[in-house]
């Protein structure tokens, strides 16, 4: 796991106009994590077009532009491990989520189908599949989903390890 950047470090990195191949799968930066404190909207477009997952830490103006927001750096190691072990799948997932944000439901389902078929034919999925059923996951009496509806926002939280 790389050390998360401050917002100033993140801004400086982007100001140097790095090539997109320096981020995402097959690069030293399969993801970028930065502290949202002090952030402004100046990097919104870059974040929206980046090839890798963008992880915001804490609170700040760019919170809604990040692919994932965590409360603090304690949550980063597991996320970092998963992205680093599955960089193509991570990239496909964030690109899917970004694309479907602006599409109609029927078109979103088509794009989702393409994304999942791409992942399921990939080497990461083929390596993961034989391991899937070997680990017995704990069962919970809690509901499988937590659904929270507030104003125009709908949050659906998966509550199962499998």
Give the residues covered by each predicted segment.
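C-terminal alpha-helix plus adjacent terminal tail
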Residues: 1-152
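Short, proline-centered helix/strand-breaking motifs
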Residues: 53, 161-162
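Terminal peptide-recognition signature
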Residues: 93, 156, 160
